[in-house]
């Protein structure tokens, strides 16, 4: 299990845990970051990551990406 920030570009895996307080977790779950969901790191642009989750590309900050654990 690693935080999304440590996954190299092109890595595909499965979200295993979303960390943070209940408001943060709810916000991320509303965006599609749910345990058991497949995720792929598409690119890293400065302080942001672009990921593919549920067939949607989403840009998230490094701070947010640290809260998402994947295997």
Model regions and ranges:
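Compact, glycine-rich, soluble single-domain proteins
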Residues: 1-71
